[in-house]
Amino acid sequence: MHPSMTLLAILPPLVRASIGNPHLLPTPPMGFNNWARFMCNLNESLFLDTAAAMLDTGLHAAGYTRLNLDDCWMASHRAPNGSLPWDPTKFPHSLPWLSAQLRSLGFSLGIYQDAGNVTCGGYPGSYGFEELDAHTFAEWGVDYLKLDGCNVSPAGAVSLADEYRARYARWHSVLGAMPHPLVFSESAPAYFVDPQNATAWYGVMDWVPAYGELARHSTDILVYEGEGSAWQSIMVNYRYNTLLARYQRPGYFNDPDFLIADHPGLSLVEKRSHFALWASFGAPLIISADVPGLSKEVIAVLTNADLIRVDQDALGLQATLASRSEHLDVLTRSLDGGDRLVTILNRGDGGLAVKVPVGWMGLQRCAYQAKNLWDGEIQEIEEDIEVQLDSHATEVFRVSLPPDCPMVIPTGIVFNTASGNCLTDGEALAFEPCRGQDLQVWQVEESGILRPLSRTSHCLTAIGDNVVVKPCTGRPGQRWTYHITGNLQNQHTGACLTEGTGIDVCGFELDSQVFGLPSGVDIEA
């Protein structure tokens, strides 16, 4: 075996849903969680009032049916038999009673626990009580578990990453043995985020999809009374999510955290962008807000049927970056039935006039219809979509493909997830800051051939220790394989694309060798 293939061969199997059953959660969850808005100030009345408001405002009818408790719901100590009681002051009628009440209204109850011996809020954790807690929750009528990762300490020579994996694997095993497994939301990756080196983070991300249905992968979104910019918090989690598209598919979803729909630091434009981006990602839509107090304008955003349809699309793909420049992101993905999603975000502080060519969408010149998913307006396009974007605004289009138009080719930037630099065609192939140019947009064919949009007669080619762009001839070195690890491996040489050296022996989740590619590209173990 080629030395560069050895590390890839020992990686975890290709992403699969928890319990081996993608039907447990075929589409992202939608609902409510108290944490970002109320933190530990949760109680029975909050959840009943939230349920009533969701029924009255149309949120329930739109699909928001999960009401999830977060930390601090439990008593301060376990019972003598080891079981975990609820706080009787916060939940005087009991959690089984609350679960039954919510179920009678058409909702389901989710719950929070922690993989350590103590939760983040200082309450009893699940370590050593996994099976007892799982069956207790099921007896209460709970069908969704968010497992946090505070206070996890390895013993002896065990690494921290291995300890997390063992504890989440234990929960996976317990849930898998139950007649009706709970949906399993894993927070393990969030404890390995390191802006200086992502190797450990990706190492955890490689296994979480095998154990659960969704993962809280990075920093917590800003809470209601937190300090700092709510918009910047959204953008931080947005960025992390763009690095992880390769993991997502039906049955497993990347979770960039809650929709903070009533945060006082957000304008309505920013709230619209928050929702549109999460829907474009196919991310969980979990509202953390004072739902009875939401304005009609915000309710209209959260119940946008066209965007919810995108979020719940059966293909389960995540939108990826087709193009990026200093202030502008264009994301695309394919939808069930053949339509193409185009999402355009202005990250800058001023307005932008934007033209998005059909080539960036993975299309060729033809007659298409593009529906604006905010106002429903349909426009005929052949060459591009033109749009005016206010600061921090996001427009979303659903492009219908007539049967006589060419098929979609996955198209977008090939970017290093650590540096953010784009693979750039030119006299000398290089990684450069992304500038929103065809030189940095690549078509990725099913055969493994990559062509720059600037000259589609040429292909990314490995020659010896170098990687260049040469005329496409079918020569050895012009076919590549994209791995779940983010490695782009040449099928002829066995080496991996590497920022800084061009191509090199494949390592394990090295920052220089992990790349984001367009949505829809085939992914190998």
Swiss-Prot record:
Family matches, as Gene3D superfamilies: 2.80.10.50, Aldolase class I, Golgi alpha-mannosidase II
GO cellular component, as recorded: extracellular region
Pfam families per record: Melibiase_2, Melibiase_C, Ricin_B_lectin
Leader sequence segment: 1-17
Subcellular location: Secreted
Family of the protein in this entry: Belongs to the glycosyl hydrolase 27 family.
InterPro entries listed in its UniProt record: Aldolase_TIM (IPR013785), Glyco_hydro_27 (IPR002241), Glyco_hydro_b (IPR013780), Glycoside_hydrolase_SF (IPR017853), Melibiase_C (IPR041233), Ricin_B-like_lectins (IPR035992), Ricin_B_lectin (IPR000772)
Active site: D148 (nucleophile), D206 (proton donor)
Start and end residues of each Ricin B-type lectin domain: 402-525
Protein name per UniProt: Probable alpha-galactosidase A
EC number(s) stated in the UniProt entry for this protein: 3.2.1.22
One of the protein's GO biological processes: carbohydrate metabolic process
GO MF annotations, alphabetized: alpha-galactosidase activity; carbohydrate binding
Glycosylation sites: N43, N81, N117, N197
Function field: Hydrolyzes a variety of simple alpha-D-galactoside as well as more complex molecules such as oligosaccharides and polysaccharides.
Disulphide connectivity of cysteines: C40-C72, C120-C150, C422-C434, C459-C472
Keywords, sorted A to Z: Disulfide bond, Glycoprotein, Glycosidase, Hydrolase, Lectin, Secreted, Signal
Reactions it catalyzes: Hydrolysis of terminal, non-reducing alpha-D-galactose residues in alpha-D-galactosides, including galactose oligosaccharides, galactomannans and galactolipids
